[in-house]
Swiss-Prot record:
UniProt GO cellular component terms: plasma membrane
Catalytically driven reaction(s): K(+)(in) + H(+)(in) = K(+)(out) + H(+)(out)
Main function: Transport of potassium into the cell. Likely operates as a K(+):H(+) symporter.
Topology in the lipid bilayer: Multi-pass membrane protein
InterPro entries hit by this protein: K+_transporter, K_trans_C, K_trans_N, Kup
Annotated organism of origin: Janthinobacterium sp. (strain Marseille)
Localization terms from the record: Cell inner membrane
Name listed for the protein in its UniProt record: Probable potassium transport system protein Kup
Gene from which this protein is expressed: kup
MF-aspect GO terms: potassium ion transmembrane transporter activity; symporter activity
Similarity comment: Belongs to the HAK/KUP transporter (TC 2.A.72) family.
Transmembrane segment boundaries: 10-30, 50-70, 102-122, 142-162, 172-192, 215-235, 250-270, 284-304, 340-360, 369-389, 397-417, 422-442
Length: 625
């Protein structure tokens, strides 16, 4: 029997998961039904079509969310961590670097990750915009103010990110529970008035709708998918809450409320087809509009906050895995290490979100842009999951195809339907994704070229030390720590120091930081020290992509291996690389110029590794790529 403490902890995590994980999918009822029957799609609002659409949505929630994500994908975790970056790292570790699948998996996973950024721009825009559009249902007087109010809410949201969400975050769960309870109650009220909508629970109506409408049904799928936006968040947030609380939050709270509300909106439209302009806000009558606008705006802000936090987390992982340059990362909570803030990402994302709101102008126009990013990410997740099941878990090929093939067909159908919107807004997330994909691949390849250049000119460290101590230089008091990459040979900073100062500290440590394709490396495994002789040491510090790099903390860990450091007697020598584009070799020249610009604006190693600035000596070196 579970102890009371474990039960209360599970309940608290489940409540928190309701607030963070299900904000995006929880706000989908604001706009999904409205979009399916919009005039642009040409789908007639008949009882038969209505039953078919509601059946598609309910069974989509069962198949895509309950079966695919909650049952299957949550099992494919990278040491407890989820998200497409973690899944990509897991899939890549399932095959060898020489495998024909390695590069395609890298490209696919990376593009899926960049589409998440496109999704993270549209989610705040469409969620807040559709919530505030409820004012227009009450009176057309508010029409000119919808976009300005949306922009004001979003600017306010991004402006407070630096303060963190630790204080208000505890209210996210209770507010979203109220939101889901409201969805359920509204649904039940309308189902009671038109119980025939319950026929939609029979999947025959979904299949009959697809068969009877063919092309129109295919177009409608592009809007039906809006009901499943945010499904990826179940997987992405697994590391914060664990699989069990996420499953409980889905089956006990989110899924029943969503299913009831979609059935309720269907019941409303059976009775009042004219409510199709905005069925969500007309479920309880005119008296409820203003309270619903207030509650839905809070829910939309929470959904947006979860997406913004997810963007920060994804960026931190991308930096650690070598796909983005180092950036300034601030920790906004003393107790929760996952609470981070990245200023550059925050303000850039805010600018793009505001542009999207002003440029598209309505949730209907934004909805066209939404589906492509979501369905493409779903598709990539399914493919990566197949490789994990097949090559890491070593399951039988037929079993792997059976477990993912069905979902692959559904994902391809939804993605194909959304590709019809390519010229009606779908280009927007694809453009964002393509730009970020190019930047990430360019940075990754650029770092490889820098590494190859340094390795080509590297002097083997042990040979150099052996020759150096034949006629040793003057030793001065203190400890010198030289940062060096893997297989770099003698650090350039050391060569410069010996060349100009002609001295060597009495103790010399060569420090190499390694990033592993796992979320976390425990502190007991982070530091390894090798004696090189003559008071010289090689110190290897290993982190996972969700660990916080902290060299002073690593030096404290070195005490357990007999190496103690006094910070005021320790100097860190770091080579500051100036990268120069070379038209003869490497990447295309335009990519080299992009890489050079990214290198110039990258955060310094000292800041990134939290090394005290007053203990750092930087020495310049030029590298051609």
């Amino acid at each position: 029997m579970a102890s009371p403490d474990k039960k209360s902890s599970l309940a608290a995590l489940t409540l928190a998961a309701v607030g963070i994980v299900y904000g995006d999918i929880g706000t989908s009822p604001l706009y999904t039904m409205k979009e399916v029957f919009s005039k642009e799609h040409g789908l007639a609002l008949t009882p038969e079509n209505l039953l078919g659409v509601v059946s598609l949505i309910v069974w989509g929630l069962i198949i895509i969310v309950s079966l695919k994500y909650v049952t299957l994908v949550l099992r494919a975790n990278n040491r407890g961590e989820g998200g497409i970056m973690a899944l990509m790292a897991l899939a890549l570790s399932s095959v060898t670097r020489n495998s024909r699948w390695y590069f395609p998996l890298l490209v696919m996973g990376l593009f899926g990750a960049t589409l998440f950024y496109g999704d993270s721009v549209i989610t705040p825009a469409i969620s807040v915009l559709s919530a505030i559009e409820g004012l227009s249902v009450a009176t057309e007087t508010f029409d000119p103010y919808v976009v300005p109010l949306t922009v004001a809410v979003l600017v306010g949201l991004y402006s407070v990110q630096a303060r963190g969400t630790a204080g208000i975050g505890k209210w996210f769960g209770p507010i979203m529970v109220v939101w889901f309870a409201t969805l359920a109650v509204m649904g039940v009220v309308n189902i009671i008035d038109a119980p025939e909508i319950l026929y939609a629970l029979n999947p025959w109506h979904a299949l009959h709708f697809l068969d009877g409408n063919r092309f129109l049904a295919f177009i409608a799928l592009g809007a039906v998918v809006l009901a499943f936006t945010g499904a990826e968040a179940l997987y992405a947030d697994m590391g914060h809450f664990g699989a069990k609380p996420i499953r409980m939050a889905w089956f006990l709270v989110a899924f029943p409320a969503l299913a009831l509300n979609y059935l309720g909106q269907g019941a409303l439209l059976l009775m009042h087809p004219d409510a199709v302009t905005n069925p969500f806000y007309q479920q309880l009558g005119a008296w409820s509009i203003y309270p619903l606008v207030a509650l839905s705006t809070m829910a939309a802000i929470i959904a947006s906050q979860a997406t913004i936090s997810g963007t920060f987390s994804m960026t931190k992982q991308a930096i650690a895995l070598g796909f983005l340059p180092r950036m300034k990362i601030e920790f906004t909570s003393a107790s929760q290490i996952g609470q981070i803030y990245i200023p550059a990402v925050n303000w850039l994302q805010m600018a793009v979100v505001v542009m999207a709101v002003v440029g598209f102008g309505s949730s209907s126009d934004l909805a066209a842009a939404y589906g492509i990013a979501v369905t493409a990410t779903m598709l990539v997740t399914t493919i990566l999951t197949f490789f994990v099941i097949r090559y890491r878990w070593k399951y039988n090929l037929l079993l792997c195809l059976a477990s993912t093939g069905f979902f692959l067909v559904i994902d391809l159908s939804l993605f194909s339907a959304n590709m019809l919107k390519l010229f009606h807004g779908g280009w927007f997330p694809l453009l964002l994704g393509t730009i970020l994909f190019t930047l990430m691949l360019t940075w990754k390849r650029g770092r490889e070229l820098v590494f190859e250049n340094l390795q080509k000119h590297a002097i083997p460290l042990e040979d150099f030390l052996a020759s150096l101590f034949i006629s040793p230089p003057t030793r001065v008091p203190g400890t010198a720590i030289f940062l060096r990459g893997e297989s770099d040979g003698v650090p350039h900073a050391m060569l410069h120091n010996l060349s100009h100062n002609k001295v060597l500290h009495e103790r010399v440590v060569f420090l190499t930081v390694r990033m592993m394709e796992v979320p976390y490396v425990p502190t007991t495994d982070q530091v390894r020290i090798h004696l090189l002789g003559d008071d010289c040491y090689q110190m290897d510090v290993t982190y996972g992509f969700k660990n916080v790099p902290d060299i002073p903390a690593a030096l404290e860990l070195a005490k357990d291996q007999g190496l103690e450091f006094e910070m005021m007697e320790t100097s860190f020598f770091i080579a500051r690389q100036t990268v120069v584009a070379n038209p003869v070799r490497g990447m295309a020249l335009w990519r080299e110029h992009i890489f050079v610009a990214m290198s110039r604006h990258a955060r310094g190693a000292a800041d990134y590794y939290q090394i005290p600035s007053n203990r750092v000596i930087e020495l310049g070196t030029k590298v051609e790529i």
